[in-house]
A protein has these predicted regions:
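Long, positively charged, glycine-interspersed low-complexity recognition regions
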Residues: 197-283
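SAM-dependent nucleic-acid methyltransferase catalytic core
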Residues: 1-15, 22, 69-191, 201-202, ...
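SAM cofactor-binding core of SAM-dependent methyltransferases
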Residues: 21, 25-96
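Short active-site oxyanion
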Residues: 26-29, 49-51, 153-157, 210-217
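Conserved beta-strand scaffold positions in the cores of enzyme catalytic domains, especially
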Residues: 52, 158, 236-238
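Short, polar loop motifs at secondary-structure junctions
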Residues: 35-38, 145, 221-225
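A residue-level signal for conserved active-site and pocket-lining positions in enzyme catalytic cores
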Residues: 35, 65, 113, 217, ...
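Conserved N-terminal glycine/acidic-rich loop preference
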Residues: 5, 11, 15, 25-29, ...
Length: 284
């Protein structure tokens, strides 16, 4: 099974199968905050004949997914060229930061991937340079893995819209998986330029929109009284997850209590999976 080529803060790569076991049947899958795309990539391979629509407000991230889908050979060639030309990770990062405003879409996508591999926890423009990540994450094998992705992305709809578009567009047997910017202060600057996509997220508007959503959905969120109150109209279960953060030491991880929230019944959609298993700590 092909996995996401991206390192992503709060990504669900280690718990994909547990999340997938909870999903109801669907004909169309939409992911409004695709990020690293772990759940999408897993489902795309499991159900290759179904419709998939992925989206994110993060423009550089979507440039990466689009170029990987339609222009992968040139994208990979650009990444190889920068890896060959720069032996010093800090110099590479300075070069990209100094020139990114004038980059083409292809170069922007390639720069996004490089930032993802060489910054703390893959936080791209919002994260500081990590020498350890440069040495251990920006590897030949990390680039080679990109060659497997175009087939996964074939015929997938990829957009750079506000999440509300995906929630409201009519469709038959649609299911949405949502992993939005989290509410807690420890997760407030994870991605986007200066972390703005986390800092400026309107959680009240988000809850109000989901309450009106005509499709079935499953949502992951950090646990707090505020979030529980916002989604008091839905089904909520807690779980624990270990995740890396850029605002702690490079080798440390922080335990976070999270929520799975749905507008459908958990148990009826997971006959082979106990929802109570989610209450155990999962290491990511």
């Amino acid at each position: 099974m092909i996995r996401s080529p991206l390192r992503y803060p709060g990504g669900k790569s280690r718990v994909v199968e547990k999340i997938v076991a909870l999903l109801p049947p669907f004909s169309e899958f939409r992911e409004p905050f695709v990020g690293g795309g772990s759940v999408f990539i897993h489902l795309r391979q499991k159900f290759p004949d179904r419709k998939f629509w992925i989206n994110d407000k993060y423009t550089e991230l979507i440039a990466f997914w689009r170029e990987l889908q339609s222009n992968s050979d040139n994208l990979i060639a650009q990444i190889w060229a920068w890896k060959r030309d720069f032996n010093d990770g800090k110099q590479l990062r300075r070069f990209l930061q100094a020139n990114i405003e004038n980059f083409s879409s292809l170069e922007t996508a390639a720069a996004f991937f490089v930032f993802n591999r060489i910054t703390f926890s893959g936080t791209t423009e919002a994260g500081g340079f990590s020498e350890q990540a440069f040495r251990l994450r920006f590897t030949d094998s990390s680039i080679e893995r990109l060659t497997k992705m175009p087939e996964v992305l074939r015929d997938v709809k990829i957009t750079n819209l506000d999440y509300e578009e995906l929630i409201n567009v009519p469709g038959e047997d649609v299911f949405l998986f949502l992993d939005p910017p989290y509410f807690s202060a420890t997760s407030s600057a994870l991605y986007g330029k200066n972390g703005k996509l986390h800092k400026n997220f309107d959680h009240e508007r988000f809850a109000a929109n989901l309450k009106k959503c005509p499709h079935r959905w499953l949502l992951t969120y950090d646990d707090s009284p505020f979030v529980r109150e916002l989604f008091s109209f839905a089904n909520i279960v807690s779980w624990n997850l270990m995740y890396g953060m850029r605002n702690v030491t490079e080798n440390s991880k922080q335990l976070g209590s999270e929520l799975l929230i749905t507008n459908f019944d958990f148990e009826s959609n997971a006959p082979l999976f106990s929802i109570h298993d989610l209450r155990f700590t999962i290491h990511e």
